[in-house]
Amino acid sequence: MNVLLGGFVIFATFVTLCNASCSFMPNERFPGDSTRECTDLKGNKHPINSKWQTDNCEACTCYETEIICCTLIATPVGYDKNKCQRIFKKEECKYIVVEKKNPKKTCPIDQWIL
């Protein structure tokens, strides 16, 4: 029974990670353009097959034909919203959930959404 439960937990984690919110942007190249790089929305250039993290907490990858960026932010949804509040820590790209009356005390979280 424990093996079955452990397998379910691993499967649920995998499904959650696979549902990450991603955006796709064409890597615009022009005839005769032999550069092997992508230009992101801020105008920064990245080599083909390179990866980087944006200021908006996205993990991006440069491919020949597109740039794919996926959010790194997991949003807590399974917590006591009457007793607790979520706080976004931009420098860490994550939320924490703390008690409203005592922000030094964290709250348990049952569910996250990517």
From Swiss-Prot:
Q: Which GO terms describe its cellular component?
A: extracellular region
Note whether Zinc occurs among the keywords: no
| Any Pfam family matching the protein | PSP94
Keyword list, A-Z: Disulfide bond, Secreted, Signal
The signal peptide stretch is: 1-20
Major location, coarse class?
Answer: secreted
What is the protein's quaternary organization? Answer: Homodimer; Interacts with PI16.
Similarity annotation: Belongs to the beta-microseminoprotein family.
Q: What is this protein called?
A: Beta-microseminoprotein
Q: Which organism is it from?
A: Papio anubis
